[in-house]
Amino acid sequence: MDLEKFRNDVYEMTEKLSKNLKENDRSKLNYVCQQLIEMYKKNLVKINHSVLELICASNLILRGYSVEVEKSVSDILVCDIYAKKGGGYTIIEIETGFTPPDHAMDTVDYYAARIMSKIARYSQHCSKFSLATPVMGILPIPKIFLLPPNARKKEDVDKVKELCDRYYKNPPIKYEDILNAHLHSIYLINIDKGFAKELDPQGYVDLTQSLLERSEIEY
């Protein structure tokens, strides 16, 4: 653990991002920065993920949100970004595409199931749920989450649940959580330039669909 290097890196990114914020909003980003430093001391975060969280937090603060990171929202769930504005709550989960060695032989299915499970589990704890990813990655967004709950077919919900059940058993993902899940947006994060751009889910799928189809990935 190199606390000095971590602190220097998050301070550097915070200073860079603060240039785009109003003076009275900079303290909100500094609060997030200090949260991350304290969590690093407890070995709860890593620098690559922390930088992504800072960029997403800056985007939300710019739009009037108050932001916390690594916040517990249930007995088993800790979200990356938890933001409040007025009476509404936003959760952002950042996906980098990492998969553990245990799933070296089923990486695509595992990754898709993780995305499905996050949408199903986290979206019930907020008014708006979003996924975020570095610009180098592509998220396989299941088509079912582009539809409102009343337009989702039972066989499509069952298909998502069957895949999730392969990887999530304790506890399993509930049928009702998949049926009622909602995905508000996708954030594309440019780490080098320090910004995140928000896309609606349908727009993101339209942009990435042909690449995923070439790779024979469809959920």
Question: What spans do the regions from the language model cover?
Answer:
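Catalytic cores of nucleic-acid endonucleases
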Residues: 96-159
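A structural signal for short, well-ordered beta-strand segments and their strand-loop junctions
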Residues: 68-69, 91-93, 130-133
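Interdomain/boundary linker segments immediately adjacent to catalytic/signaling cores
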Residues: 1-63
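Non-catalytic C-terminal interaction segments of nucleic acid-processing enzymes
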Residues: 2-30, 136-219
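Short phosphate-binding/catalytic loops that engage adenosine nucleotides
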Residues: 64-65, 127
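Amphipathic coiled-coil/heptad-repeat helices and related helical stalk/stem segments
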Residues: 53, 75-77, 114-115
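A conditional alpha-helix N-cap/helix-loop micro-motif detector
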Residues: 49, 72, 111-112
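Active-site beta-strand-loop-beta-strand hairpin of nuclease catalytic cores
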Residues: 75, 79-100
